[in-house]
Amino acid sequence: DIPTDVLLGLRKESGAASAVGRNAFSRYTESQIPVVGTVRAGYGALAFEEDYGKEYACVKDPENYFFLVVKGDSMEPRISDGDLALVHRQNTLDNGDLGVLVYGADGEGTLKKYIQRGNSVILHPFNPAYEELVIKGEELDHLYIAGKVVETKAKW
């Protein structure tokens, strides 16, 4: 355990605690991560744009992350229109993860809670005004996982 006053920088670290503290976070660096476009918090297009800027994030492997600007209100009250979603590039999600998913022949992209039940996947919005999307059978062949949402940032 690292004392609170050391974590807050009120006291210098010493002995074994200092080595543990440094090693625990040494793989994480604050990096500029590209904001590559927008994603619907609803059901719609996943739009990638060339130059949307950069945001800082503290991650282990910055080349495997990107930010998207959230559009829509289906993930309210936890994720709002205009928030930034930090996404880790990966093609699998665990049950209950928030993910950026592309679904359908038109390649509609969305940010939703991923729920797997038996042989179906449910894309769950937090906002009760929106319905869940249930994907099953051969429809699952048209579901692509772009990544896992690991953090969101609100802009004020």
Feature map (PLM): residue ranges:
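Short, positionally conserved secondary-structure boundary motifs
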Residues: 5-81, 95, 105, 109, ...
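Low-complexity, intrinsically disordered Gly/Pro/Thr-rich segments
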Residues: 128-139
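Well-ordered beta-strand positions in beta-sheet-rich domains
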Residues: 84, 111-113, 134
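Short glycine/proline-enriched turn or capping motifs at secondary-structure junctions
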Residues: 137-147
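SH3/SH3-like beta-barrel fold
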Residues: 123-125
